[in-house]
Amino acid sequence: MSGGRGQVVGGRPAGCPRSFCGCGASIRVFGHIVPGLNLAANWLRFPRTSPAPGMVAARRGHVFVLEQHVEGDIWMAYDANSGGRSTRIHARSLRGYTVVNPRAA
């Protein structure tokens, strides 16, 4: 579930593939492209954790970065390739996603 269109903050970052949610998330989290994380499913290799700012919601096919808790399972998210080839900050449900800690290895 997406809570409205949110705020568009960009498009496909330079150097990212056509399907760029994983690439955009790696730039947001690590400050640069991590090629192995371009595939959304690869984020599921990180340890599971509880939702918190800076953690990542992942499933096969999509990934986004948690920014701020709204209520219940709704979080403001940095969501690259969130539709129309745009990157948005908008409210997203965590339903159907696994929350992982990309800084734990």
Task: Say what each PLM segment does.
Residues 5-11, 69-105:
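Aromatic- and glycine-rich peptidoglycan recognition patches
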Residues 1-69:
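Secreted/periplasmic proteins that engage bacterial cell-wall peptidoglycan
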